[in-house]
UniProtKB/Swiss-Prot annotation:
Keywords linked to the UniProt accession: ATP-binding, Cell inner membrane, Cell membrane, Membrane, Nucleotide-binding, Sugar transport, Translocase, Transmembrane, Transmembrane helix, Transport
Protein name (database record): Beta-(1-->2)glucan export ATP-binding/permease protein NdvA
Subunit (UniProt): Homodimer.
PANTHER family: ATP-BINDING CASSETTE SUB-FAMILY B (PTHR24221), ATP-BINDING CASSETTE SUB-FAMILY B MEMBER 6 (PTHR24221:SF654)
Gene3D superfamilies: ABC transporter type 1, transmembrane domain (1.20.1560.10), P-loop containing nucleotide triphosphate hydrolases (3.40.50.300)
Organism: Brucella suis biovar 1 (strain 1330)
Domains (record comment): In NdvA the ATP-binding domain (NBD) and the transmembrane domain (TMD) are fused.
Domain ABC transporter stretches: 335-569
SUPFAM superfamilies found in the cross-reference section: ABC transporter transmembrane region (SSF90123), P-loop containing nucleoside triphosphate hydrolases (SSF52540)
Catalyzed reactions: [(1->2)-beta-D-glucosyl](n)(in) + ATP + H2O = [(1->2)-beta-D-glucosyl](n)(out) + ADP + phosphate + H(+)
ABC transmembrane type-1 domain location: 21-301
Length: 599
């Protein structure tokens, strides 16, 4: 993407506040025109002094324009600052909203720290560009566009010096941009690596400390910082060279203007006031050209991060649903997977040609080895992904034809990882339903066997749980997650190994709550426990993305297939309160009795 396209796209974000932006632009143009008039008026004052004429009128006009310039500059600075700050926060919020709608696979591939780093650095760069556009860029362009024609009307010979100076600045800028383009892109990559390392180590600080990795991880960060310096310094060298060349060209131009001016005055071809005006023009032009050079530097520096941000914006925009998508209402819970196929890109993993039907109120247990596609099946139900082939229907409606918001409103999920926010206990439960009353929150906690341990905390329901629930035990985290699902009160329930971290006593309490919750609700359970599978109306055995077997527990156990093999191998966890029966090597005695199982 060219530098001009990047700049233009950055400016398009200001269109949301069109009136404020236009007002700032008009004020900036007025400031530029007033600034241009100052050297002319100053020259007239000097000429009036030289001619011993009336200096009061030009002085008064000069003072009036100076006062107006000050007020306009303050107005522009104040308005531009506020507008740039508002748009920075606005773009950050809009982009954040799109980011959190992206599928999990996108976040896993890109990395959370990468997306966060891109968002923060890009919005900071956009803020700087917007601010400089309204404060300096526009006034600089207007000033340069009017300065040369005005100077040419005064003296063509002196104007050539200013034109040559402008050409030299342009040539130097083009040279440096060409030399630093690839280097600046490399700098941005090293910035990402450094940020990712910091984020990775801090999020795993317990591992870093327990394995005595503090010195090693710090040294790794030093290495990343050194690589960043090695990539950054050549770029900085080119811009330092550009600054020196620009300063040399501007100094030489001032000398030429003074020498030519003095020569023309002695020959009677120019007045002293006109020479003074040209000196003011030269100083003004040098200042504006320096601003242009700084602007190019800013844009080149921001180029890589903005290109990455725009690519991220385009990717998230493609995920946005069209307006007026139908909602899924009055869900009964009849669910059909009709020849559903989905495969993760370049992985060979997914689910293939899966078909089954679940009647309203039925409980489905999904079992199978690791990587069988159990979680993928659930993610497809919630439209984290859309099928590549086939269709998923709820109450006869294809889920792709309804809004994700309404679909997910109909599904309450208890994830394997509880996924708690660094907020209070009540706020975490209230994620299930934001407008729930305190009494409803407490009732959900009681149903999930969480109320007693919450009250035992120092702040009760106002206790902050820490980052990802770090201040709670594994069982406490899962009970809050279950309370959240209970509070949501959705017609479809998904439990992803929801009771795996609970002790026997607590699990029994939670199981009763879940049984009550799942009554008359369509329930999917990714199950590792025998009791869960036994009580299910339908068991789906997944392996390598294929639905190998389906039916009731007894049907599959008696069939002598893969599910029966899983039972014989003890692949489902026994309840802790049930004593394990010994297995004699070489015998056909199973670890627990299964009616009709085949030896």
């Amino acid at each position: 993407m060219s530098l001009l396209k990047i700049y233009w796209r950055a400016m398009q974000y200001l269109a949301v506040e069109r009136t404020a932006t236009i007002t700032m632009c008009v004020a900036s143009v007025l400031v530029a025109l007033v600034t241009l008039a100052e050297p002319v008026l100053f020259g007239r004052v000097i000429q009036s002094i030289s001619d011993k004429g009336d200096i009061f009128s030009p002085l008064l006009m000069w003072a009036a324009l100076g006062g107006f310039n000050i007020m306009a500059a303050v107005f522009v600075a104040r308005g531009a600052d506020r507008l740039a700050h508002r748009r920075r926060l606005g773009v950050m919020i809009d982009s954040y909203e799109r980011l959190i709608t992206m599928p999990l696979a996108w976040h896993q591939k890109r990395g959370t720290s990468n997306a966060l780093h891109t968002l923060i650095r890009a919005t900071d760069s956009l803020f700087t560009l917007w601010l400089e556009f309204m404060r300096q860029h526009l006034t600089t362009v207007v000033a340069l566009a009017t300065l040369i024609p005005v100077a040419m009307t005064m003296d063509m010979r002196m104007s050539l010096v200013l034109i040559v100076l402008g050409v030299i600045y342009v040539m130097i800028g083009q040279l440096v941009m060409r030399k630093t383009k690839d280097g600046q892109a490399a700098v941005e990559k090293h910035h990402h690596k450094l940020f990712e390392h910091v984020s990775d180590t801090i999020s795993n600080v317990s591992v870093v400390q327990s394995y005595n990795r503090i010195a090693s991880e710090t040294q790794a960060l030093r290495d990343y910082a050194k690589n960043l310096e090695n990539a950054q310094f050549p770029v900085l060298n080119w811009w330092a060279l550009a600054s020196g060349l620009n300063r040399m060209a501007s100094t030489f131009s001032m000398v030429v203007v003074l020498v030519l001016g003095a020569y023309f005055v002695t020959k009677g071809q120019m007045r002293v006031g006109d020479v003074i005006a040209f000196i003011g023009f030269a100083q003004l032009m040098i200042g504006r050209l320096d601003q242009i050079s700084a602007f190019i530097n800013q844009t080149v520096t921001a180029r890589a991060k903005l290109e990455e941000f725009f690519q991220m914006e385009d990717a998230t925009a493609d995920r946005q649903e069209p307006e007026n998508v139908a909602d899924l209402n009055d869900v009964k819970g009849d669910i059909v997977f009709d020849n559903v196929t989905f495969e993760f890109p370049n992985s060979g993993q997914g689910i293939y040609d899966v078909s089954f039907e679940v009647k309203p109120g039925q409980t489905v247990a999904i079992v199978g080895p690791t990587g069988a596609g159990k979680t993928t099946l659930i993610n497809l139900l919630q439209r984290v992904f859309d099928p590549a082939a086939g269709r998923i229907m709820i109450d006869g409606t294809d889920t792709r034809t309804v809004s994700r918001r309404s679909l997910r409103h109909a599904i309450a999920t208890v994830f394997q990882d509880a996924g708690l926010f660094n907020r209070s206990v009540e706020d975490n439960i209230r994620v299930g339903r934001a407008n729930a009353t305190h009494e409803e929150v407490h009732a959900a906690a009681k149903a999930a066997a969480a109320h007693d341990f919450i009250l035992a905390k120092s702040e009760g329901y106002d206790t902050f749980v820490g980052e990802r629930g770090s201040q709670l035990s594994g069982g406490e985290r899962q009970r809050l997650a279950i309370a959240r699902a209970i509070l949501k009160d959705s017609p479809i329930l998904v439990l992803d190994e929801a009771t795996s971290a609970l002790d026997v006593e607590t699990e029994e309490k939670v199981k009763q709550a879940v049984d009550e919750l799942s009554h008359n609700r369509t329930t999917f359970i990714i199950a590792h426990r025998l009791s869960t599978v036994r009580s299910a109306d339908l068991v789906l055995f997944m392996d390598k993305g294929h639905l190998v077997e389906s039916g009731s527990f007894n049907e599959l156990a008696e069939r002598g297939g893969r599910f029966s093999d899983l039972l014989r191998a003890g692949g489902l966890k026994l309840e802790d309160k049930q004593p394990k029966q010994p297995v004699v090597e070489g015998s056909n005695v199973m670890p627990f009795p299964v009616k009709g199982a085949v030896a």
